[in-house]
Amino acid sequence: MTLSPLLLPLQLLLLLLFSGAVCRAEAGPETESPVRTLQVETLVQPPESCTESAAIGDTLHIHYTGSLVDGRIIDTSLTRDPLVIELGQKQVIPGLEQSLLDMCVGEKRRAVIPSHLAYGKRGYPPSIPADAVVQYDVELIALIRANYWQKLLKSILPLVGIAMVPALLGLIGYHLYRKASRPKVSKKKLKEEKRNKSKKK
């Protein structure tokens, strides 16, 4: 009989722990963690006749609707002309650009984009808060394929621009060197040469 007063607090403690575990199990899983990777879902399948899909360098005409996860629309092109972008030129947020790769004309996709591939820690006040996950529904209206020479030119042009700086500096240095290495003619000699030329005339 002396053990029962000691067991009572232990029984109460076990009862509390067990009831807490039951309550957590009934509440279900904790709230979802924020989206960390790009999630792309096809809403309208590409036509079977699709032979060309979007690739880096191509020009795309797209209609889109961007929204926050709570459903608030942040931007849409449905009330105006389609947006024209060139893939690979960073004209839209990275997550949206990645979701457009391999898309066919007539296809429609939904992209759920984590903040680090969207507007990041700054957001885009006032419509997009910091660290916001955004969702874009995108339809590819038209695709203009970049030819081989256009792609080559666009990849080489920045390199040519970078190479021009040292080339120009080299030319300037060479010009200054040639100018400095010429024998200096005195002013007196120059005057004499001018007089001699004028006498000959």
UniProtKB/Swiss-Prot annotation:
InterPro entries: FKBP2/11 (IPR044609), PPIase_dom_sf (IPR046357), PPIase_FKBP_dom (IPR001179). It is a single-pass membrane protein. Keywords: Isomerase, Membrane, Rotamase, Signal, Transmembrane, Transmembrane helix. The keyword Signal applies. Residues 1-27 form the signal peptide. Its main location: membrane. The chain crosses the membrane at residues 156-176. Residues 57-144 form the PPIase FKBP-type domain. It holds the Pfam family FKBP_C. One of its GO terms (biological process) is chaperone-mediated protein folding. GO terms for molecular function: peptidyl-prolyl cis-trans isomerase activity. It comes from the Eukaryota. The keyword Secreted does not apply. It catalyses: [protein]-peptidylproline (omega=180) = [protein]-peptidylproline (omega=0). Interacts with IFITM5. PPIases accelerate the folding of proteins during protein synthesis. This is Peptidyl-prolyl cis-trans isomerase FKBP11.
